[in-house]
Amino acid sequence: MAKGQSLQDPFLNALRRERIPVSIYLVNGIKLQGQIESFDQFVILLKNTVNQMVYKHAISTVVPARAVSHHSASDRPQGERPQEKTEE
């Protein structure tokens, strides 16, 4: 896998897996909305009332409707523990 996709794939996969609604802005300014059905190296399949195949080279920004955690345990450096929430 190319080093440039080490962030892209886990991020898109988390959006797909959790069915998080997204806004996708294209380089020409058009805004598309929906859920990521699937993706590969070149395209994202966006599902709304219809399915749209969007070429990644035409995408400027992907904005999730809510925060998404896309880092798995294997993404952390060895020996690093996940952050624990502390009560105040």
UniProtKB/Swiss-Prot annotation:
MF (Gene Ontology): RNA binding
Residues in Sm domain copies: 9-68
Gene: hfq
Full protein name: RNA-binding protein Hfq
Keyword RNA-binding: yes
Quaternary structure annotation from Swiss-Prot or TrEMBL: Homohexamer.
GO BP terms: regulation of DNA-templated transcription; regulation of RNA stability; regulation of translation, ncRNA-mediated
UniProt xrefs under InterPro entries: Hfq, LSM_dom_sf, Sm
Region Disordered: start-end pairs: 66-88
Keyword entries, A-Z: RNA-binding, Stress response
Cross-referenced CDD domains: Hfq
GO cellular component terms, A-Z: cytosol
Family stated for the protein in its record: Belongs to the Hfq family.
PROSITE patterns for this protein: SM
Biased composition (Basic and acidic residues): 72-88
SS bond list: none
Biological function: RNA chaperone that binds small regulatory RNA (sRNAs) and mRNAs to facilitate mRNA translational regulation in response to envelope stress, environmental stress and changes in metabolite concentrations. Also binds with high specificity to tRNAs.
NCBIfam families, per the entry: Hfq, PRK00395.1
Domain of life: Bacteria
Biological classification of the source: Bacteria, Pseudomonadati, Pseudomonadota, Gammaproteobacteria, Vibrionales
